[in-house]
């Protein structure tokens, strides 16, 4: 599912909302999650999961084509840990 499909599903299930309003709401949610992660904060959605950022330290990598050693810089990467209810639902629990 892509963002536009999510917007369409929410709009269909909530006919009292205008499509434009649903687009704005979904966009605002993603913007807030992104902003929180960019500030180094954790975003927890109970039952669904938690978004956070993890540090990947600098390391020496290898170019797979040439075999040459390459220095890979330190970076921050997004991380998602599923919540208990989501894991249970995915595994046929509910």
UniProtKB/Swiss-Prot annotation:
PROSITE patterns linked to this entry: HISTONE_LIKE
Record's GO cellular component terms? chromosome; cytosol
Origin superkingdom: Bacteria
**What is one process in the GO biological process aspect for this record?**
regulation of DNA-templated transcription
On whether Translocase is a keyword of this UniProt record, the answer is no
Keyword list, A-Z: DNA recombination, DNA-binding, Transcription, Transcription regulation, Translation regulation
- CDD domains under this entry? IHF_B
Q: Which InterPro entries match?
A: Hist_DNA-bd, Histone-like_DNA-bd_CS, IHF-like_DNA-bd_dom_sf, IHF_beta
Could you state a single Gene Ontology molecular function term?
Answer: DNA binding
Q: Record keywords: Hydrolase included?
A: no
Pfam families attached here? Answer: Bac_DNA_binding
- Role summary: This protein is one of the two subunits of integration host factor, a specific DNA-binding protein that functions in genetic recombination as well as in transcriptional and translational control.
Q: Which family does it belong to?
A: Belongs to the bacterial histone-like protein family.
Which HAMAP family does this entry report, sorted A to Z? IHF_beta (MF_00381)
Q: What interactions and quaternary structure are annotated? A: Heterodimer of an alpha and a beta chain.
Name of the featured protein: Integration host factor subunit beta
Q: Which organism is it from?
A: Mesorhizobium japonicum (strain LMG 29417 / CECT 9101 / MAFF 303099) (Mesorhizobium loti (strain MAFF 303099))
């Amino acid at each position: 599912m892509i963002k536009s499909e999510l917007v369409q599903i929410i709009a269909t299930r909530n006919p009292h909302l205008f499509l434009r309003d649903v687009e704005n709401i979904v966009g605002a949610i993603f913007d807030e999650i992104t902003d929180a992660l960019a500030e180094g904060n954790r975003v927890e959605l109970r039952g669904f999961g938690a978004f956070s950022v993890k540090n990947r330290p600098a390391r020496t990598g290898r170019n797979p084509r040439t075999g040459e050693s390459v220095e890979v810089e330190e970076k921050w990467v997004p991380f998602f840990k599923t919540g208990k209810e989501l894991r249970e639902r995915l595994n046929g629990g509910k």
